[in-house]
Design a protein with these regions (language model features):
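Bacterial N-terminal signal peptides
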Residues: 7-17
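Conserved redox-active cysteine motifs that mediate thiol-disulfide chemistry
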Residues: 57-71
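Short pre-active-site segment immediately N-terminal to redox-active cysteine/selenocysteine motifs
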Residues: 51-53, 58-61, 131
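Conserved helix-turn-beta segment immediately C-terminal to the redox Cys motif
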Residues: 69-90, 107
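N-terminal "domain-start" segment that seeds a small globular fold
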Residues: 20-45
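Thiol-/selenol-based redox modules, centered on thioredoxin-like
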Residues: 137-171
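Positively charged n-region of N-terminal signal peptides that target proteins for export
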Residues: 1-4
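Short, internal strand/loop/helix patches
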Residues: 86-88, 103-140
Length: 171
């Protein structure tokens, strides 16, 4: 009985963080982050001050991530095109070649978005969560305004509403 109690306690201790509520970083100032883009450019998030920034963390093997990325151009990119908005889909934990291959497949299907690389998962560590899919919305003041992990069909609609609100708050 004691052994069962110890095993149950260990299970709860190890598994509970997986189900912890996301959004814990909401309100936090974004640390200095430089994203290496798939095309070789570097984007410093601090240079995006004044813009609303959406970071979408994903992996080539993650089916929920790919579902979300397939919806991204229509629900997010086209809606905010030409406004003070920046979106980067950050592939984490994978080599450039694998990411480039998957992005080429997606582009053949008409799914086009800016792609950043985080092969050593340093960016997601800086933002405090390594799970995927993950969306982080950074306000014009470079503070995290939305942080959500996991995929639901409604999630991009919710994110779009937050982005719209942040864009409308700007002078």
């Amino acid at each position: 009985m004691k052994r069962l109690s110890v095993l149950l306690s260990a299970f709860v201790f190890l598994v509970f963080p997986l189900f912890a509520q996301s959004g814990s970083r909401t309100g936090a100032k974004v640390p200095a982050i430089t994203v290496e883009m798939l095309d070789g450019r570097e984007v410093k998030i601090s240079k995006c001050r004044g813009d609303v920034v959406l970071l979408s963390f994903w992996a080539t093997w993650c089916k929920p991530c790919l579902r979300e990325l397939n919806e991204m151009p229509e629900k997010i990119l086209r809606r905010f095109e030409g406004r003070k908005f920046t979106m980067i889909a950050i592939a984490k934990g994978e080599p450039r070649e694998r990411v480039a291959e998957k992005v080429a497949q997606l582009r053949k299907q008409g799914v086009v978005f800016p792609v950043g690389l985080d092969p050593y998962e340093k960016i997601s560590q800086l933002l405090g969560d390594e799970r995927i899919p993950q969306l982080v919305i950074i306000g014009p003041d470079t503070r995290v305004r939305y942080h959500e992990v996991g995929y639901t069909p409604e999630r991009l609609d919710e994110a779009a509403e937050i982005i719209e609100k942040l864009l409308n708050e700007q002078p």
